[in-house]
Every structure is written in structure tokens, then in C-alpha cells.
């Protein structure tokens, strides 16, 4: 028997260009289970219980799983951990999405599936978590340790005696891989995998042979040493030089602005970014995938910068600035609206988690974003010109005209009512599609959460992610905005939400197809079979648990449904199907779709 350890090279910083792979996360470990003694009982001194204790130690109290014959014994031992709850999902893809949503709230998530048929099913969700810099522990129940190297063919494989197909697939979307088929090194591999996920803020893969979880071993008889992750520190000389150069660059600008990007999460730099905004007085914007990371009630907040589809008057201020500092940006074809942003490199300071680049000039490595922003705040001159310009040109958006009592509901009216539902005790999850653009216009109250998956953009993500986020934050009311096409991809785990007693509100926007794809490139393949969605959810409910549904076609019905969901059914899972016209799309989606389509349609370069 041998133990294979995958490379962690994928985590090493290799590309610091704009839009390059994110890296550099530093995580704090929370020990949620006080240790009352240094030893554990012999029946608990097993590999399975050791893994369970380690998950609890880092703050994971819920694991999302799908049972299979290779992971059943492992699941028994995870269930036996009193501080760990096993959440059975309807399929592996949703289990992975749930772990993704959980990690967005708790800081780390975990899922357990079976060998190959489960592993390859969850792979898409793991890839999404990798792209979004989320630490996620993907655990797979693997073949019996005696079968390695025997040239045997096993079920749940592609019919070859080589068992590494699954491992090779995961190597591309995880930062560390451990195949545990002997007990001697199991604790070391588990600890290395978990600590690597936390350090790199990326998913890891752990495969455990199905005959090992129940075996006692003296190694597991003592409580493990708590995780102590080394804190990354900036190179002081580089930090000082970067701050001096950036301060000189910004202090001579007339109307500089700040723009927050999604990598602020992995850099844990949101507070430092706000500190810089307070000190500078600059207009403060966020990229779309950073919405929710910066308080929108900040006095200098000017909205979402998304090129041609920015919130009102934000693009005018950002693109007319003579200097802009981007903290943790990702410039891909989606966030750049088909590479159409009107930005100039010579005007930009790009701050990545561990690197600062100033205009066309110097780049400073080994400089942590959090340290850089905090030190820069001490050196920057106050200049509120960009915010004053925004305030001068800003015209408040008019409220949508009230619908006639029996008129078909308009999408902008729907989101006006969703806006009124938001509070510090709520969170919004936006599915890929027109909800991206409508939710960007929501003004988040202080403390209101917000999540969506922009880099990977996998339709259907929000169903599983809503399950995981709500499980991690039971005291928040999660509001999910999901299109009908996306819902059909992953709808089954509404069942799990009801079974777990979650009080989520899902707005199912029924417009008869894949609207976002229609605006990129239309065709008959974007038309879907209409479901009776409320009847579908009622069938899943089947009289067990708290569930309430409504189908609304006009504003009057919507108001009544929201009132019910937020009052007498506030402790229930609520599903509101909103029927709108298929052509009722946001102008932002129309603009964005045409530009992304143009980028996709570029002819080949001449050879």
C-alpha cells in the first residue's frame, strides 16, 4: 500500500497580472469545541472520528453529503461526532454547491461523496469554489486499501484497474490532494490538507479508503494539537516603498476613486479598504463580484462599477477619474463587459492580495493588501472631489410606476419590493442571469449579506448555495432570486431546505427560458419546458415540515405574498413563483449581453 500526495503547486503565486489567478489568503482557525481532556475514549480513537473532530475544530458544524457504498462507514463516524451534523443532499452537485455557500458564510465548508461517481459529480461545484477562492474540504470515500496495486477492476470506475482517474481530475481544481490508504500517515495528511485549504483559501481533496474509518489507532487517542496557521507578513521594505509610491501617485491626482474587488475577501482586507476610504474621502465603488464586501451605507459609496452596465452615474465618475485604486480586482470578460472597460493602465493602482502595481511603473511583491491599505490610509491626503462630482450629477432613480391591479407584474416592480424586505438580518443570493443585474441595484442595509458566483457563473449554483448559506446562518432570512431555467438544473434540494427547517424565501422568476443566454445568442435551445413550480415544491413538501408557496402574476398578489411570507409564515420555507413576460429584462442585461456576444464572436486572428 502506498499513499499519494498531490502537488500544492497550484497554490503558489505564479501570475500577478490583471485578472491573474487569485492567491494569498490567510485564514483564522476557530476552535469551537473546548477540549476537556487530552485523551479520547478507545471507541472514538478512529480515523473517522479524528476527521470529524478536525472539521469541528475549524468551525465546520455541518457537512453536506450523498451516501454511497464507499463512504458509508465514514458517514457513521461523522454522525457519531456530537458537534457535527450531516446534511444529506439530493445529489453531489448540490452538496458541493451547499459547501460553497456554507464557506461563504462560515469561512470554510465540507462535503462527503463516494468514489468517482460521486467525485466526478461534485467536481463542477469544486471548480466553482476554486474560482471564487473558497476553502472547501471535499472528502471522498475511496476503494478498500487492499485493492490498490492489485490490477483489479472495481465498480463506480470507468472499468480500468487504475484508480487515479478521479484524483487526476481533482488536481486541476484543488490546491492539495491526499489519498489515504494506510493509517500510519492519515493524521498528517488530513491535517496538511485542511491547513492548506485554510492557508490558500482554495478547495482540497481527501480520499479515504472505505475500510479505514472505523479502525482504532493510538495516534487518534489523544486530542490533536489545534491548528496554528502561520500569519503571512509583508516585506517591510517593499511595503514602505509601495506605500510611498502610491501616496505620491494619488496625492497629485485631482479626482481619484477607490474600487473594491472580489479578492478583498481572500485577503481579509475589507476593513482596511474602508479605513482607506474614510481617510481619503475618495468616491468608493465596488466591482459587481465584490458587492456585499463593502458597506453600502458608507457616506462616500457611489455604487457598482461594471463598465457600461454600472449602477447610475458610477461609471462616469470612475472612468473620468485621473487615478483609481482597484483593491483585489478580477478583470475577466464578464466583469469587463466583453473587455470594454474604459480604463487606462497608467492611471491605475492594482492591489492584489500580495502584490501592488502602480500604473506603468513599479510592482512591489510580498506586500499584503491589508497592510498596504492600512498604511496608505495614514499617508493619503483627503480629497473628496470624485464624491462631490458624483453627488453633483446624481439623480435619484424614480420609483417604477405602480402596476394596474390586474396588469402583468414587471421585474423592476418586483425588485422594488425585495428592496423593502432587506435588513441586517437578511442575505441575498443572486443566481446567474438577469438576477445579477437586478440585484446589483439593491441597496444593502448595514449587515445585510450578499453572494453570487460571477467568475465561474454556473447556472443552478444558487439552489445549493442557498441551502449551505442558510444552514451556516440560521438566524438570517436568506432571500434567493432564481430564474426558472437555473432552477430546473438543481431544484431537488429545495427538499433538503424544507427537511432542515430553513426559513429561506425563494423568488422564482418565471420568464420561460434562459434569459441571459437569449441576450448573448438566441436560439430554440434557450426555450425550456414550463413547470408548475409551486405544485412541484408542494409535491416535495408532501406535508412534512414548514413550507408555503404562492404564484403571483400582478403587484397586488406580490404584495400579499410578501406580507404572508414575512409575517404568519416567517418561520417557514417560502417559495414565491413570479410570472413575468419573457421579454421583461433589464436594460443592463441587454447591453451586457450584446457586448459579451461581440467578444465571443470575434473572428480568429490572421495567421
UniProtKB/Swiss-Prot annotation:
Transmembrane feature ranges: none
Key words of the record: Decarboxylase, Lyase, Magnesium, Metal-binding, Pyruvate, Stress response, Thiamine pyrophosphate
Reaction catalyzed: a 2-oxocarboxylate + H(+) = an aldehyde + CO2
Binding site for substrate: 69, 156, 517
Keyword set includes Lyase: yes
Region Disordered: start-end pairs: 1-22
Induction text: By abscisic acid (ABA), salt, osmotic stress, wounding and paraquat. Not induced by anoxia.
Expression tissues: Expressed at low levels in roots, shoots, flowers, siliques and seeds.
Cofactors: a metal cation; thiamine diphosphate
ATP-binding among keywords: no
GO cellular component: cytosol; plastid
Region listing for Thiamine pyrophosphate binding, in residue ranges: 434-516
Family annotation (CDD domains): TPP_PDC_IPDC (cd02005), TPP_PYR_PDC_IPDC_like (cd07038)
Annotated residues for binding of Mg(2+): 484, 511, 513
Subunit field text: Homotetramer.
PANTHER family found in the cross-reference section: PYRUVATE DECARBOXYLASE, PYRUVATE DECARBOXYLASE 2
Protein name: Pyruvate decarboxylase 2
Organism of this sequence: Arabidopsis thaliana
Gene for this chain: PDC2
